[in-house]
Curated annotation (Swiss-Prot):
It comes from Psychromonas ingrahamii (strain DSM 17664 / CCUG 51855 / 37). Its EC number is 2.7.2.8. The gene is argB. This is Acetylglutamate kinase. Keywords: Amino-acid biosynthesis, Arginine biosynthesis, ATP-binding, Cytoplasm, Kinase, Nucleotide-binding, Transferase. It catalyses: N-acetyl-L-glutamate + ATP = N-acetyl-L-glutamyl 5-phosphate + ADP. Catalyzes the ATP-dependent phosphorylation of N-acetyl-L-glutamate.
């Protein structure tokens, strides 16, 4: 596959699922882009906000360990329903409305990814690895838009919830895609609140130490740096500005490029 046609994987944060207009703008931008370009696209998504809502309605208290949701196996049907069901189909609905040939998938479909339990203390939380790219490559070749939830199935036949960032990295490795993290920020800001065009580990560590990068942005940056270690580089941009997304897809500099 040539560089011009290298797939782009868009990882969507769960917060965008609560913003109907942002979703419509996003998929409209993708539709505009694909009218003139043939670059294969994929989406991997989380859905923590919807999981929280479902568990709350079930009167289930949710706990986290080092930022990862503890998911007892008796809770995984609700979590899988929220992620592979509600979250995935909300995105599918917007994609289809925009005229995109979207296909809703999980990490398990077509044996795309293998998963093992991450930590017994976390319960039904898995870590995935690339396995078989045939299904995704076929869909991409035929012009479909895979929309992939972070639910996987282990060799033990049990359902697992995988961190969506890690799932996105794994799918990128599987199909040779570039990775774009879309969140609610334009990129990483410097001390003057200007977007940093390119960020490496050394600069990120300094800005975190100086508390220029902190709280939620620090979490995003650390995830991006981890992804860059495996993929070479990733992009951070905002779903709030769909016009910038079209520019980014066209190869223009938008947001922050995170490198090793």
């Amino acid at each position: 596959m040539t560089q011009a046609l290298k797939p782009l994987l868009i990882k969507l944060g769960g917060a965008v699922l609560e913003n109907e207009q942002a979703l419509e703008n996003l998929f409209s931008a993708l539709t505009v882009y694909l009218q003139t370009e043939q670059r294969p696209l994929l989406i991997v998504h989380g859905g923590g906000v919807i999981v929280e809502d479902v568990l709350k309605k079930m009167n289930i208290v949710s706990y986290k360990k080092e930022g990862l949701r503890i998911t007892p196996f008796e809770q995984i049907p609700y979590v899988a329903g929220a992620l592979a069901g509600t979250s995935n189909k909300l995105l599918m609905a917007k994609a289809l409305k925009a005229g995109l040939s979207a296909v809703g998938l999980s990490l398990a479909d077509g044996f795309s990814c293998k998963v093992t339990q991450l930590d017994p203390d976390l319960g039904a939380v898995g870590i995935c690895s690339p396995n078989n790219p045939a299904l995704l490559n076929t869909l991409l070749k035929e012009g479909y838009l895979p929309v992939i939830s972070s639910i996987a199935i282990g060799d033990d036949g049990r359902l697992y919830n995988v961190n969506a960032d890690q799932a996105a990295i794994t799918i990128c490795e599987l199909v040779g895609a570039e990775l774009l993290f879309l969140s609610d920020v334009d990129g990483v800001w410097d001390a003057h609140k200007q977007v940093i065009p390119e960020l490496n580990t050394q600069l990120a560590d300094r800005l975190i130490a100086e508390k220029v990068i902190q709280d939620g942005m620090a979490v995003k940056v650390k995830a991006a740096l981890q992804a860059a270690e495996q993929l070479g580089y990733v992009m951070l941009a905002s779903w709030k500005n769909p016009e910038n997304l079209v520019s980014l897809l066209a190869g223009q500099a938008v947001g922050t490029k995170v490198v090793k």
